[in-house]
Amino acid sequence: AVRTEKPQAVAEAPAGTTCDRLVSLSDLYATLADYFGVALADDCAEDSVSNLPLWRNPSADAVREDAVQQSIDGSLTIRSGKWKLAMCPGSGGWSYPKPGVDDTSLLPAFQLFDMEKDVRETHNVIEAYPDVARELRDRLTKYVLDGRSTPGTPQANTGAPVWKTVKWLEEQAL
């Protein structure tokens, strides 16, 4: 059991206020720990960042530079600013083209989307912005190899590297 003093209000921003900063569902862990004053061990919630400053002041500085997501088939994406790099052909998830259901053999192995102009992710702009794609891939590679996307001691990924969805780690080019 954790005993804490009565915490202050979670959100101090006026009702109806919006925040355009990048956050991730994984941030809930660190945010709640921060709210309740619980220190997290270095090997706990390695991809979680507290959003509490944003709950209290939506115009505060961003709490994270980028976010990693994993789709239902295990494919990884990285989101940074207006960019999203998907390390898979197709959707990697529930929408068309679905992995294992729809033919993705003729699709590019990787996709880059400008989320400010294309929130539906329909226009792959990887050929127009190869430097952006390489930068995002390099960051994602570091996160996977470090076992975390936050500062701290690198963490081991458990088990043998059998994820087919990270085979791009061994490939050189995008």
Q: Model segments located where?
A:
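C-terminal cap/loop subdomain of S1 sulfatases and analogous C-terminal strand-loop tails that border
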Residues: 7, 13-17, 21, 26-29, ...
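Long, internal low-complexity/basic segments
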Residues: 28, 80, 91, 100-111, ...
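Short glycine- and hydrophobic/aromatic-rich loop-to-beta-strand nucleating segment
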Residues: 1-2, 23
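Compositionally biased, intrinsically disordered low-complexity regions
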Residues: 5-8, 172
